[in-house]
From Swiss-Prot:
Record-linked Gene3D superfamilies: Peptide methionine sulphoxide reductase MsrA
Key words of the record: Oxidoreductase
Molecular function in Gene Ontology: L-methionine:thioredoxin-disulfide S-oxidoreductase activity; peptide-methionine (S)-S-oxide reductase activity
Reactions listed under catalytic activity: L-methionyl-[protein] + [thioredoxin]-disulfide + H2O = L-methionyl-(S)-S-oxide-[protein] + [thioredoxin]-dithiol; [thioredoxin]-disulfide + L-methionine + H2O = L-methionine (S)-S-oxide + [thioredoxin]-dithiol
Matches recorded under InterPro entries: Met_Sox_Rdtase_MsrA_dom, Met_Sox_Rdtase_MsrA_sf
Entry's family note: Belongs to the MsrA Met sulfoxide reductase family.
Swiss-Prot/TrEMBL GO biological process terms: protein modification process
Keyword presence, Iron: no
Protein name as it appears in the record: Peptide methionine sulfoxide reductase MsrA
Organism: Psychrobacter cryohalolentis (strain ATCC BAA-1226 / DSM 17306 / VKM B-2378 / K5)
Enzyme Commission number(s) from the entry: 1.8.4.11
Positions annotated as active site in the UniProt record: C10
Functional description taken from the UniProt entry: Has an important function as a repair enzyme for proteins that have been inactivated by oxidation. Catalyzes the reversible oxidation-reduction of methionine sulfoxide in proteins to methionine.
Length: 173
């Protein structure tokens, strides 16, 4: 089992994508990367903690390799715009990969370089993982528990459609 932490905008959206990927054992929404010694939704959304909304993804690499996890991540968010994902603006929405094992870094670097070789100006930050602050229970499995939420209904279905189109062999049936 491997773990990687991904920040690609609102964690409700990234969580929904990765809950749909075969081999993903758990997805936990949370906060990471800031200077504040604690984190909660209100403080992080205020933009003053330095933390990012992230998801901690635990996956079985014999089912879904890290390369695919990263390809899904980069395909389902905008890695080219600093501190913004759609209407969500602020450093708490920046694109970032936190690796939990040094052996993951070369794969992350290769994936980003592959995108850059294709002319994509990736601004995604890459850092070793630091303390992870789990988000409040209300933010876990958010879209599945709040199917009528307007923001989610606007932002998540296009990401899931892209996942279905480009990574159908890795989607949970």
């Amino acid at each position: 089992m491997q773990t990687i932490i991904l920040g690609g905008g609102c964690f409700w959206c990234t969580e929904s994508v990765f809950l749909s990927v075969k081999g993903v054992q758990s997805v936990i929404s949370g906060y990471m990367g800031g200077d504040a010694v604690s984190a909660n939704y209100e403080a992080v959304c205020g933009g003053n903690t330095g933390h990012v909304e992230v998801i901690k993804v635990e996956f079985d690499e014999s089912i879904v390799p890290l390369e695919v996890i990263l390809d899904v991540f980069f395909a389902t968010h905008d890695p080219t715009t600093m501190d913004r994902q759609g209407n969500d603006v602020g450093s708490q929405y920046r694109s970032v990969v936190f690796y939990t094992d040094e052996t993951q870094k070369p794969t992350i670097d290769r994936t980003i370089n592959k995108l850059r070789d294709m002319g994509i100006n990736v601004v995604t930050e890459v850092h070793p993982a630091v303390e992870f602050y789990q988000a409040e229970d209300t933010h876990q499995d958010f879209f599945n528990r709040n199917p009528g939420q307007a923001y989610c209904n606007f932002a998540i279905p296009p990401k899931l459609a892209k996942l279905r189109k480009e990574f159908s062999q890795y989607m949970v049936s």
